[in-house]
Curated annotation (Swiss-Prot):
Pathway: Cofactor biosynthesis; adenosylcobalamin biosynthesis. Belongs to the CobB/CobQ family. CobQ subfamily. It holds the Pfam family CbiA. It comes from Nocardia farcinica (strain IFM 10152). This is Cobyric acid synthase. The lineage of its organism: Bacteria, Bacillati, Actinomycetota, Actinomycetes, Mycobacteriales. The active site is at 338 (nucleophile), 443. Keywords: Cobalamin biosynthesis, Glutamine amidotransferase.
């Protein structure tokens, strides 16, 4: 098998990322050399690659589904929104500009060249390249500058599968309409459809799928069921709805639950940090946006932000800032990560991200943050709570810690020996702990299993949850691998494999009809 295809969607969050991840895992299990690709992503959930670049977290997950180390090749252009109108532009893993729509147009020729070069390189190296679109190709107002949907498909002659989310309703109209509004040469690349998140008896849907095939001349390759047990790293903030749970809580090992309230910041970044907590039996994690929701939580997490000063102002306006201060004063557990850590310091000086200058923080931690370029992008390893830790840093802020004690020791080397043996390297103190609060710049910290267990025991003790017991064997990596295998099983079972292989190897069939709006 050799080829490439593009998985597009009728909307954002239709399921493009998970379908690509499932296909990647399915093909990798068969021994196919497969790689993911997303030409341009817009997301504040990102990871750091081994070579110090930054890519969307969804592409990192897809890479792991393929058995590959995440690389900037898989996501050469990343836009990180800092406001409704401006985003940080990351090219081949490095921030190069902060752009609005007009500024972005200046870069488009160079970006097309970057995208074309990376995709050509991957197609030469791998048997199959599975590309993911962005948003929806039906956003025809953006067609002239499109890098990730039909612009990519046309440039690289890629067949396209369109995914629609039936759980939101109107999926048949979405699928038909997506094709119908495209220009004729784009329509000719649409090879088929996938219906995602279906609940119930699929036979009841078949008449609609048959009619869709009559109207469009294109088949539906499969109907993927709504799998409540399936949850994977969120690509963007659409999955972080206030009052919504994270993952699916599992019954506690002991007699008590540990409840976690994760603050849903308006410009939240790396929201996936809390998913490691949700892997633990007896830990229930929920997104919150009101101060009243903090009262009953055993632990509050303040995650990262792409607009630290703006989100700090939001904490103050909503009363969450004062509620956080009161928690810490009372000795009740709070974990602040990256931007959240900076907000809880005494002072922020920001001439880089927001241009706001000097801003007072919430004063929980005795530290000052000054934003500077270039951005810190690094993988780290170290020790915390007597256990090895691994993670990564993505931030402009440089902190000066004064009175608070650090609680981590780190080294800027992802594979360094840190366990005290004769090859161990010296560690640099990192983070702050004071009262009931811990702060750190390190994302992914809670995925270090031994550290997470030891730290949760301390959190439970401080919260008075003496009946809470940490499971002795929870592995975040194993949970994620199991989720990818479950997803691959669903894709393998419910998608027409023969049709998929034909599209991959032969491209979109010739002679597909061109639809016109209003056609019936």
């Amino acid at each position: 098998m050799k080829g490439a295809l593009l998985v597009a969607g009728t909307t954002s969050d239709a399921g493009k990322s998970v379908v690509v991840a499932g296909l990647c895992r399915m093909l990798a299990r068969r021994g196919v050399r497969v790689a993911p690709f997303k030409a341009q992503n817009m997301s504040n959930n990102s990871v750091v690659t081994l070579d110090g670049g930054e890519i969307g977290r969804a592409q990192a997950l897809q890479a792991r589904a393929c058995g590959l180390e995440p690389s900037v090749r898989f996501n050469p252009v990343l836009l990180k929104p800092g406001s409704d109108r401006r985003s940080q532009l990351v090219v081949r893993g490095q921030a190069v500009d902060t752009v609005g729509a007009a500024d972005y147009f200046r870069h488009r020729t160079a970006l097309r060249e970057v995208v074309a070069a990376e995709l050509a390189s991957l197609r030469a190296e791998f048997d199959v390249v599975l590309c993911e679109g962005a948003g929806s190709p039906a956003e025809i107002n953006l067609r002239a500058t499109d890098l990730a949907n039909m612009g990519l498909a046309r440039a690289a002659d890629l067949p396209v599968l369109v995914v629609g989310d039936i759980d939101r309703g109107g999926v048949l109209a979405h699928l038909f309409g997506t094709v119908a509004v495209l220009e004729p040469d784009d329509q000719r690349l649409i090879a088929g459809f996938v219906v995602n998140k279906f609940r119930g008896d699929v036979d009841l849907l078949r008449p609609g799928l048959d009619r869709l095939a009559e109207l469009t001349g294109r088949p539906t390759l499969g109907v993927l069921p709504f799998a409540e047990e399936l949850w994977l790293d969120a690509e963007d903030s659409l999955g972080t709805v206030a009052d919504a749970p994270v993952g699916r809580p599992r019954p506690p090992v002991g007699t008590e639950w540990l409840t976690v309230a994760a603050v849903r910041l308006p410009r939240i970044s790396n929201s996936t940090d809390v998913e490691a907590l949700a892997c633990e039996p007896g830990v229930a994690v929920r997104w919150v946006s009101e101060p009243s929701r903090l009262a009953d939580a055993d632990l509050v997490v303040v995650p990262g932000s792409k607009s630290t000063v703006s989100d700090l102002a939001w904490l103050r306006r909503t009363g969450l800032g004062e509620a956080l201060r009161a928690r810490v004063t009372a000795g009740r557990p709070v974990l602040a990560i990256c931007g959240g850590y900076q907000m809880l310091g005494r002072r922020i000086v920001d001439e880089v991200e927001s241009g706001a200058g000097e801003v007072a923080g919430l004063g929980v931690f005795d530290l000052e943050t000054e934003f500077a370029a270039p951005k810190v992008l690094r993988r780290v390893t170290g020790m915390g709570a007597g256990n090895p830790v691994r993670g990564y840093e993505i931030h402009h802020g440089r902190v000066r810690r004064s009175g608070d004690a650090p609680w981590l020791g780190l080294v800027d080397a992802p594979e360094a020996a840190v366990d005290g043996g004769e090859d161990a390297v010296p560690l640099t103190p990192e983070g702050s702990v004071t009262g009931g609060a811990w702060g750190t710049h390190v994302h992914g910290l809670l995925e270090s299993d031994g550290f997470r267990r030891a730290w949760l025991r301390e959190v439970a003790a401080r919260a008075g949850r003496h009946g809470f017991q940490v499971a002795p064997d929870t592995s975040v990596a194993a949970v994620r691998a199991g989720q990818l295998d479950l997803l691959a099983d669903l894709v393998e079972k419910h998608l027409d494999q023969d049709a998929l292989e034909r599209i991959l190897t032969d491209g979109a069939p010739t002679g597909l009809p061109v639809l016109t709006v209003g056609q019936a």
